[in-house]
C-alpha cells in the first residue's frame, strides 16, 4: 500500500503539492478558530442545586431542604457523587455525574428529581439549578464605580444602592447577551427596595397588625384586564390599572379605618427607599464596590468569550452616566495570553534549534528545507484535528510537542534520497535524467518505509498509557497525548506523500553526500572511545549497571506531586474570621487588609474581595469569610524586578499576619478552583472525617488539625468552621400560646415579618422592578428588648376588636452559639481539615501525616477518615500507570520483535529504556524537581526515543553481518557509520525541549519537568547506546561468531543501500 502511495506522490507531484497547500489552508483556517486557554478544563459533569431557605438555621436547612433534595437525587443514571453544604438560609447540593455524561441530559435528570422534591419542601423554599458553567467559568470580573465628586441628575452623590441598580439594570442585561456567557453574578451594594417601616405603637393604637399592612399593599398594587367592549364598530380593551407609581402612592394606601376615618400607610409608618438584608458585599482597595462576574457557558473558549465581554464592556462604558464607569479587575485573557506566549516562544525556539541541526548534519540546504517544512505542515494538520475534536491549545496540550521527534520520519526519507541520488550521480558520472531521478527517489522512499512505520508506531504506542488515565488526570493529560499522536500521524502522512514529491521536484542536479566538519570532529572523538569500550567489556557493563542501580536509589528519594503549580502571576487570599462575625464587621476588617497591603507593596495593582454569598449562590460563603484577589503589576514595573514571586508572597503573608482577627489561606485564582473541583476543598491536601454527630466530628477534627500543624511543610492548616454561629432563638411556650388562643404560626409570622421582612408586591419603573418590603425600623429590629415588646395580635373577640400582648408573654429570647454550616458527602455528614503544602512535595507529606494521625488520634467507632486533594489524583494516576506502562512497553517489544524477528536483538534494543531512565532521574535530581505526572509523561516519551536510538544502530550492524562482515568489523563499522543518525536523533529531540527546560515565563513550571526528563534521558541514552550497545551486541552474538567460519575482515567504510533508520 505504501509503495503505491509513494509512487502516486512522485508521479502526481504537483497534485500532491496542491493537496498539501489545501491542507495547509485548512490548517490556517482551523488555527484562527482554535480555542485557546491556559490549562485544560478539568471540571467534572456536575449540576448545582441552590435553595434559598430564608430564616432557617444550618441544622434546619439541612433537615428541611438539603436532605430531601439529596434523597431524590439518589439512583440517578450515571451518578458518581453528591456533595452538599447547608448554611444559614442557603442550601447547595452538587450532583456529580460520570465523565462522558451530557451536561444537558444531566440537568434534565436533576430537574425532574427537583420536581419530585418540591412536595417535601416547606412552602416558599424553591430549589433552582445553578448556571450551565464549569468550575473554571469565572473568567471576567469588573466593578461599577463612581468617580470622586460624581453626582446624579438631582445633585446628590451616588450611593452603593445606585451603583447596584446600574449594574443590575444597565450592565447585566447587555452582558448576558454576549455569546458564550451563561450568567452574570453580582455582589456588593444594596438591592433597591421600597421599604414600609411601620411603627409598633401606631399599629397597636389603631388595632392593626403587620399582616394587615402586607395585605393592604398586595390589594392595592395590581393592574386588571376586563376583556373588551364593542362600540360603534370599534373594539375597546377594558383595563383597570392599580399599580403604584410613586412613593406617595404607597403612602396613601388605606390599611384600615378608625371611627369612620381611613388609616393610610403614612399614618402608621414611614415609606422610603431602603436596603435589602444582603448576604454578601464586595470591596476593592479598601472601599465598598459593586462587583460583577461573568460565568462562561460550558464548552466555550475562555479567551474568545473574555474578549467579547471586554469589547461589550467598552461599549457600555460609553453610555454610562457621567462619572460612573466599569473597571475590569480580572480578565482570564491576561493569563491565557501570557501562557500561550510561553508555549509559542518555546515551540519557535525549539523549531529553530531543530532546523539548525538539520542544516549542520544533512549538508544540503534544499534537503534541510524540505525536512524543516514538515514542522509547520504537521502543526497545521494538528490544529485541524484539535478543532475537530474540540481540544484547546494550552500549556498541557502543546506541552509535549517536540519537533525533533515529529520530523524523524521525514529525515529518514530525505537523507536516504540524498544518499541514493548522490551515489547514482557518482555512478553515472553525470546529472541524472528526470526518470532516473524519480526512480532513485522511489527506491529510497520504498527502502525507508519499514523503519519509518516502525519508528512512528513505537513513539505512538508509548503514549498509549496516557490515554488510560481517567478522571481529573485524564482530562489534564489526554489532550497532550492526543496532540502528539496527531502531529506524528500528520508527519508520517507527509513523509510518504509530500516529502517524495518535494524531493523529486526540488533536489536533482549536482547532489553530493559529504560529511561536514562537525561530523568529522565527532567521529575522531568517538572512535577511540568505542575501541576502549570494546576492549574493556567488564568495566563498561559494570559502570552501566552501577549507573542504573544508583539512579534507582535516587528515584526512591525523589519527592512526588500531581502536577507542578502554575504560577498565574496573581494571588488568591481567603480571610477567615470567627463564626458569627457580622457582614458589616467583616467588610470593615477586609478594608483594613486591602488598604494595608496596597500601601505596603508597590508591586500590587489592586486588591479586591467578595465577602459572604453573592446573588447567585454558586459559592456559598458565610459573612465571616472574604474571598480576595491580589492582582500584581507586571514584573518589569516592580521597584525590585529581581524579587521573586515566592519572596513577594512570603512578605505579603507576613504583613497580613500582623492584622488581628484574621486567619488566611493563600493560593492562586485558578489553582484554588482546581483544588475545589478535585476534592470539594480549596487546599492542596484535605482530610475528611465522616460520621453522624457534629460535636464528635468537630472534636476529632481539632485533634487531627493539631497533628497536621506539627508536620514539616504544612501551612494554613484549618478546620472547617462548623460551629460557633451566634443565634437569637425565639422559644415559644406552647402552653402559654394556647392559653391566649394563639397558634405557633401566629407568633412565628409576627416575628418573621417584623424582623426578617416580607415581600408585599413589586414596584415597576419601566423595565426595572423593585420589591416592596414590610419590615420594622432598624432601631427596633436590632434591639432585643424592643423585640420582647413586639405586639402579637390575639384572636378577635366578640366586639371584633384586635388586642395585643407582647412577645415576652408567650416566648423567651435566648442567645447562644449554634451550627455554622453542615457539609455532607454521599449522604453522610463530614468535616474537612485542609492544609497547603509548601517547601516539600505532597507525595512524601501525606504518608508522614497519615502515620502521625494514626498513631496520635483515635477515630471513634462509626466514624472514618479519607484523604482528598491533589494527592488523591496522584495516587490514582500512579496506580493506573503502574499497570498500563508495562503493557505499552510489552507492545514496543512486540514491534521490535516484528522488526528483527529475533528476541535477542529486540532485548538489546530494549536496553535503551533503562539507560534513558537513568538520565531522566538524574536530571530531575540535579534540578531539584519532584516526580510528577508531567515528569512521568516525559519518561513515557523518552522510552520511544531511546528505543529509536538502539534501532538506528542495531539495524545497520545486522545488515553488515548479513553482507558478510565479521562480528567485530560489523560492530565497529556499524557504530561509526551510524554515529550521524544517532547524534541527529539525540540532538533534534533534546534541543527541541531545551527552551521548555530553561523557560521562565508564565506556565514554564508545568512544562519544565517533562523537558528536563527528556533532555537528561536522551543524553544518557545516547552516551550509553553509542558505547554500551556495541559491547552488549558483541557479547550476545559471540557464540554465533565462534560457530561460523572465520571471514575476511572488511576495512573500508561501508555505505549500504538500505535506507537510514529513524533519526
Curated annotation (Swiss-Prot):
Where this protein primarily resides, as one coarse class?
A: membrane
Q: Sorted alphabetically, which InterPro entries does this protein's record hold?
A: AcrB_DN_DC_subdom, Acrflvin-R, CusA-like
UniProt keyword annotations, A-Z: Cadmium resistance, Cell inner membrane, Cell membrane, Cobalt, Membrane, Plasmid, Transmembrane, Transmembrane helix, Transport, Zinc
Biotechnology usage: In the presence of 2 mM Cd(2+) or 4-10 mM Zn(2+) up to 99% of the metal is removed from the culture supernatant and is sequestered via bioprecipitation. Additionally Cu(2+), Co(2+), Ni(2+), Pb(2+), Y(3+) and Ge(4+) can also be removed from culture supernatants, although it is not clear which efflux system is responsible for all these substrates.
Cell compartments where the protein resides: Cell inner membrane
Q: Name one Pfam family in it.
A: ACR_tran
Please state, per the UniProt record, what induces or represses the expression of this protein: By zinc, cadmium and cobalt (zinc being the best and cobalt being the worst inducer).
Q: Where is the composition biased (Polar residues)?
A: 1049-1063
Query: According to the lineage, what is the superkingdom?
Result: Bacteria
Q: Name one GO biological process term.
A: response to cadmium ion
Chain spans, region Disordered? 1040-1063
By its UniProt entry, which NCBIfam families does this protein fall under?
2A0601
Protein name, as recorded:
Cobalt-zinc-cadmium resistance protein CzcA
Q: Which gene codes for it?
A: czcA
Amino acid at each position: 500500500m505504501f509503495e503505491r502511495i509513494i509512487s502516486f506522490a512522485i508521479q502526481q507531484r504537483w497534485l500532491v503539492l496542491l493537496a498539501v497547500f489545501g491542507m495547509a489552508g485548512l490548517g490556517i483556517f482551523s488555527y484562527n478558530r482554535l480555542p485557546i486557554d491556559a490549562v485544560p478544563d478539568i471540571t467534572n459533569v456536575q449540576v448545582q442545586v441552590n435553595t434559598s431557605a430564608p430564616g432557617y438555621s444550618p441544622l434546619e436547612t439541612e433537615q428541611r431542604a438539603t436532605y430531601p433534595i439529596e434523597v431524590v437525587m439518589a439512583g440517578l443514571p450515571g451518578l458518581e457523587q453528591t456533595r452538599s453544604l447547608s448554611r444559614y438560609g442557603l442550601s447547595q447540593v452538587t450532583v456529580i455525574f460520570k465523565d462522558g455524561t451530557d451536561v444537558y441530559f444531566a440537568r434534565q435528570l436533576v430537574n425532574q428529581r427537583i420536581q419530585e422534591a418540591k412536595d417535601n419542601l416547606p412552602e416558599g423554599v424553591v430549589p433552582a439549578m445553578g448556571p450551565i458553567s464549569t468550575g473554571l467559568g469565572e473568567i471576567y470580573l469588573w466593578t461599577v464605580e463612581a468617580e470622586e465628586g460624581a453626582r446624579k441628575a438631582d445633585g446628590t452623590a451616588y450611593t452603593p444602592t445606585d451603583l447596584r441598580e446600574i449594574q443590575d439594570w444597565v450592565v447585566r442585561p447587555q452582558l448576558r447577551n454576549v455569546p458564550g456567557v451563561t450568567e452574570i453574578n453580582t455582589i456588593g451594594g444594596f438591592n433597591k427596595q421600597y421599604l414600609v417601616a411601620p411603627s409598633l405603637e401606631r399599629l397597636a393604637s389603631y388595632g392593626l397588625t403587620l399582616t394587615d399592612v402586607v395585605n393592604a399593599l398586595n390589594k392595592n398594587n395590581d393592574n386588571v384586564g376586563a376583556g373588551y367592549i364593542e362600540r360603534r364598530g370599534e373594539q375597546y380593551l377594558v383595563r383597570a390599572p392599580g399599580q403604584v407609581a410613586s412613593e406617595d402612592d404607597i403612602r396613601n394606601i388605606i390599611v384600615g379605618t378608625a371611627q369612620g376615618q381611613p388609616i393610610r400607610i403614612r399614618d402608621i409608618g414611614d415609606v422610603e427607599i431602603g436596603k435589602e438584608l444582603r448576604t454578601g458585599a464586595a470591596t476593592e482597595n479598601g472601599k465598598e464596590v459593586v462587583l460583577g462576574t461573568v460565568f462562561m457557558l460550558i464548552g466555550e473558549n475562555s479567551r474568545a468569550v473574555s474578549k467579547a465581554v471586554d469589547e461589550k464592556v467598552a461599549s457600555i462604558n460609553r453610555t454610562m452616566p457621567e462619572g460612573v464607569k466599569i473597571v475590569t479587575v480580572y480578565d482570564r485573557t491576561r493569563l491565557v495570553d501570557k501562557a500561550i506566549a510561553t508555549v509559542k516562544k518555546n515551540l519557535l525556539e525549539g523549531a529553530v534549534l531543530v532546523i539548525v541541526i538539520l542544516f549542520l548534519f544533512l549538508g544540503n540546504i534544499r534537503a534541510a528545507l524540505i525536512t524543516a517544512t514538515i514542522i509547520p505542515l504537521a502543526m497545521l494538520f494538528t490544529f485541524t484535528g484539535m478543532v475537530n475534536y474540540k481540544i484547546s491549545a494550552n500549556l498541557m496540550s502543546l506541552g509535549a510537542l517536540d519537533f525533533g521527534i515529529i520530523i524523524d520520519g521525514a529525515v529518514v526519507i530525505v537523507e536516504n534520497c540524498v544518499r541514493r541520488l548522490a551515489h547514482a550521480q557518482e555512478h553515472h558520472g553525470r546529472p541524472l535524467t528526470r526518470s532516473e531521478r524519480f526512480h532513485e527517489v522511489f527506491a529510497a522512499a520504498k527502502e525507508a518505509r519499514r523503519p519509518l512505520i516502525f519508528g512512528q508506531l513505537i513513539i505512538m504506542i508509548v503514549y498509549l498509557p496516557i490515554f488510560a488515565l481517567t478522571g481529573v488526570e485524564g482530562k489534564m493529560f489526554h489532550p497532550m497525548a492526543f496532540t502528539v499522536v496527531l502531529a506524528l500521524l500528520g508527519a508520517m502522512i507527509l513523509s510518504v506523500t509530500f516529502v517524495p514529491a518535494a524531493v523529486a521536484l526540488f533536489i536533482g542536479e549536482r547532489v553530493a553526500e559529504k560529511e561536514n566538519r562537525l561530523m568529522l570532529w565527532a567521529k575522531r572523538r568517538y572512535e577511540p572511545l568505542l575501541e576502549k569500550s570494546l576492549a574493556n567489556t567488564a568495566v563498561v557493563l559494570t559502570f552501566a549497571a552501577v549507573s542504573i542501580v544508583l539512579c534507582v536509589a535516587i528515584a526512591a528519594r525523589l519527592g512526588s506531586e500531581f502536577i507542578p503549580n502554575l504560577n498565574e502571576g496573581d494571588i488568591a487570599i481567603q480571610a477567615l474570621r470567627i463564626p458569627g462575625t457580622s457582614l458589616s464587621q467583616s467588610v470593615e476588617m477586609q478594608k483594613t487588609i486591602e488598604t494595608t497591603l496596597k500601601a505596603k507593596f508597590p508591586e500590587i495593582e489592586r486588591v479586591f474581595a467578595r465577602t459572604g454569598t453573592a446573588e447567585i449562590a454558586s459559592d456559598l460563603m458565610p459573612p465571616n469569610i472574604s474571598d480576595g484577589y491580589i492582582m500584581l503589576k507586571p514584573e518589569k514595573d516592580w521597584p525590585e524586578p529581581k524579587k521573586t514571586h515566592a519572596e513577594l508572597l512570603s512578605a505579603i503573608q507576613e504583613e497580613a499576619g500582623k492584622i488581628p482577627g484574621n486567619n488566611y489561606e493563600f493560593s492562586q485564582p485558578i489553582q484554588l478552583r482546581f483544588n475545589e473541583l478535585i476534592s470539594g476543598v480549596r487546599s492542596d491536601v484535605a482530610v475528611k472525617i465522616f460520621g453522624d454527630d457534629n460535636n464528635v466530628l468537630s472534636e476529632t477534627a481539632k485533634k487531627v488539625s493539631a497533628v497536621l500543624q506539627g508536620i514539616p511543610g504544612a501551612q494554613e492548616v484549618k478546620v472547617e468552621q462548623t460551629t460557633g454561629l451566634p443565634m437569637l432563638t425565639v422559644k415559644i411556650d406552647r402552653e402559654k400560646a394556647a392559653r391566649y388562643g394563639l397558634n405557633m404560626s401566629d407568633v412565628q409570622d409576627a416575628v418573621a415579618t417584623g424582623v426578617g421582612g416580607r415581600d408585599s408586591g413589586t414596584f415597576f419603573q419601566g423595565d426595572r422592578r423593585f420589591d416592596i418590603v414590610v419590615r420594622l425600623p432598624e432601631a427596633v429590629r436590632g434591639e432585643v428588648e424592643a423585640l420582647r415588646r413586639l405586639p402579637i395580635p390575639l384572636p378577635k373577640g366578640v366586639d371584633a376588636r384586635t388586642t395585643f400582648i407582647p412577645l415576652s408573654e408567650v416566648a423567651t429570647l435566648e442567645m447562644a452559639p449554634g451550627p455554622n454550616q453542615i457539609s455532607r458527602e454521599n449522604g453522610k455528614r463530614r468535616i474537612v481539615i485542609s492544609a497547603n503544602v509548601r517547601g516539600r512535595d505532597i507525595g512524601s507529606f501525606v504518608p508522614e501525616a497519615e502515620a502521625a494521625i494514626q498513631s496520635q488520634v483515635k477515630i471513634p467507632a462509626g466514624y472514618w477518615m479519607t484523604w482528598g486533594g491533589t494527592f488523591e489524583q496522584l495516587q490514582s494516576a500512579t496506580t493506573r500507570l503502574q499497570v498500563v506502562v508495562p503493557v505499552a512497553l510489552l507492545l514496543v517489544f512486540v514491534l521490535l520483535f516484528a522488526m528483527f524477528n529475533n528476541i535477542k536483538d529486540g532485548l538489546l534494543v530494549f536496553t535503551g529504556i533503562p539507560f534513558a531512565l537513568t538520565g531522566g532521574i538524574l536530571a530531575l535530581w540535579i534540578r531539584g524537581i519532584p516526580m510528577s505526572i508531567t515528569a512521568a509523561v516525559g519518561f513515557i516519551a523518552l522510552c520511544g526515543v531511546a528505543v529509536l536510538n538502539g534501532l538506528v544502530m542495531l539495524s545497520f550492524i545486522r545488515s553488515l553481518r548479513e553482507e558478510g562482515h565479521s562480528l567485530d568489523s560489523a560492530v565497529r563499522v556499524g557504530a561509526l557509520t551510524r554515529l550521524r543518525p544517532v547524534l541527529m536523533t539525540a540532538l533534534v529531540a533534546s534541543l527541541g525541549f531545551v527552551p521548555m527546560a530553561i523557560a521562565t515565563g508564565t506556565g514554564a513550571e508545568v512544562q519544565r519537568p517533562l523537558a528536563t526528563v527528556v533532555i537528561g534521558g536522551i543524553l544518557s541514552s545516547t552516551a550509553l547506546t553509542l558505547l554500551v550497545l556495541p559491547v552488549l551486541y558483541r557479547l550476545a552474538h559471540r557464540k554465533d561468531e565462534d560457530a561460523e567460519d572465520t571471514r575476511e575482515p572488511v576495512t573500508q567504510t561501508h555505505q549500504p543501500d538500505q535506507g537510514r533508520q529513524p533519526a
